[in-house]
Amino acid sequence: MGNGVASFSGCCAGTTAGEISGRYVTGVGLVQENLGHSFCYVRPVLTGSKSSFPPEPPLRPDPIPGTTTTFRSISGASVSANTSTALSTSLSTDTSGIASAFESSNRFASLPLQPVPRSPIKKSDHGSGLFERRFLSGPIESGLVSGKKTKEKAKLKKSGSKSFTKPKLKKSESKIFTFKNVFTNLSCSKKSVIKPINGFDSFDGSSDTDRYIPEINSLSTIVSSHEKPRIKEEEDKTESALEEPKIQWAQGKAGEDRVHVILSEENGWLFVGIYDGFSGPDPPDYLIKNLYTAVLRELKGLLWIDKGESYNRNGESNIEKQSTVEHASDSDQENCPVMNGNDVACGSRNITSDVKKLQWRCEWEHNSSNKSNNINHKDVLRALQQALEKTEESFDLMVNENPELALMGSCVLVTLMKGEDVYVMSVGDSRAVLARRPNVEKMKMQKELERVKEESPLETLFITERGLSLLVPVQLNKEHSTSVEEEVRRIKKEHPDDILAIENNRVKGYLKVTRAFGAGFLKQPKWNEALLEMFRIDYVGTSPYITCSPSLHHHRLSSRDKFLILSSDGLYEYFSNEEAIFEVDSFISAFPEGDPAQHLIQEVLLRAAKKYGMDFHELLEIPQGDRRRYHDDVSVIVISLEGRIWRSSM
């Protein structure tokens, strides 16, 4: 969305240069720095658990009733269409910043998106002629997460885990191996992928909660300039902890899209943030730097508590907002039950903490027969909303000194998984789409009806091939855009004196999304007046035209849930929800060792090229910025909710 940031610095995690060059010899000279990246994470086999799983049958019966699922694997990919722009708050005038980049802790693996050489496309030798490869192998198929890592590889991974937000002290601490380095011996960019916003890196003050909130920067050996020097003993402890960090993290950007993934295998939780910016990189950069820590702070006492503290289960939530929450469980309901919060405006501080002191509630309640019943899901959702409010409030403080920030904003999609509980918060038009198997009894009744009706040969083949494995999409969040009639009616009702509140299918003729983080000039007259006259809108009245009021939703995973697709809206310019889950399901059935998120990115580009009468390579040859006319920045994350999707990943 918007005109944003764009260039590349990929991280080839978990492998050596020799291994990559040997595997991708056909890609020499074809490296594109500004395109995108593909990454993956595979849950390690825990002590005492099975080290392998039986192959998946082509037609799988419905899983045993009563079984539960949790995430096992994460496949992610992003592609940029926008050009690179500098932060508005940055003193640098350098516009050569990278537009597509990725960095992570040691258990994530990533590779840049690299098109195959121009040549007649060969059909895959995996036994299926339905898919054509346009990119080189992603990290899953490449085996970057297979087998045991040697000490040398672990060191490479450690050196490649750098901070998005903190300045570097040593070159050795920021060394990173890129795909381009493998082939051309060129050095990787030494600039941080996400620059701090000057003057608002952190706020003064602290609380008891602050000491126990893990922040991504706490996993790095990089220290900020205002921190006290550590003694050698402390540094040794830190380096020892970094060998196997308590939490795993990944951060990436493609154009103005930002992706943030943080997880803990030990405590069974996963945080995913997708921030789709518009008009500038500042809001998504600010979100990736601040929202996660704000969420953890608000969740204290709900999902985690400090050691030595007890949790009052009868305590009331300290958020007094009136909202209605609905929960989805393993039922026949296939619609999108959600909760819409009140108008919000957001803020947080940057706090470094000791991850070892963090204890999630499940550790204190392990004797409970049903842990989910001990969590007030309504309070968790409201805590997410509160975190978003505080993050936007602190971002608004910057607008006083930098009025141009009032033009910029971002869509927000946050997914928090804790065991079998999934919490989704969103503003804007990004989507969380669950792929779910339909009810078995319904399917049996449907098959009985199909026996007595005349079917076409194609329908018969489809039913035979897909059987009971046919998946149904369940969108877990509401979309906030002018494409939703309910949103258009709301804005017109709130602005009865402004006949141009919605113009050319956009809010005030400017923005297609009806809710967003930032974009203050559409929320308060004072931010509109602070802009140069050429950028102002005709602000009628004082009511906001757009809000940051999020869609909130809780879902309890069941045996029927197969995978979850999280994506910015660029995916849905060319896919419906049904098409997206069918594409992923078909792909992983044909290629258990493939990268489904990368495949979706490829299909978006193929459909965009076909729509405008070009081939795949012709589209990618169009310069960034100009290519935005054909497709948006796209970020996709596919989360497996079963024991295993990809054989090569185990």
UniProtKB/Swiss-Prot annotation:
Its cofactor is Mg(2+); Mn(2+). GO terms for cellular component: nucleus. InterPro entries: PP2C, PPM-type-like_dom_sf, PPM-type_phosphatase-like_dom. Residues 239-641 form the PPM-type phosphatase domain. Mn(2+) 1 binds at D276, G277. It is found in: Nucleus. It is an enzyme of class 3 (hydrolase). Disruption phenotype: No visible phenotype. It catalyses: O-phospho-L-seryl-[protein] + H2O = L-seryl-[protein] + phosphate; O-phospho-L-threonyl-[protein] + H2O = L-threonyl-[protein] + phosphate. Pfam families: PP2C. Residues 148-166 have a biased composition (Basic residues). The keyword Manganese applies. Residues 146-166 are annotated as: Disordered. GO terms for molecular function: metal ion binding; protein serine/threonine phosphatase activity. The conserved PP2C phosphatase domain (240-639) is interrupted by an insertion of approximately 100 amino acids. PANTHER family: PROTEIN PHOSPHATASE 2C, PROTEIN PHOSPHATASE 2C 36-RELATED. This is Probable protein phosphatase 2C 36.
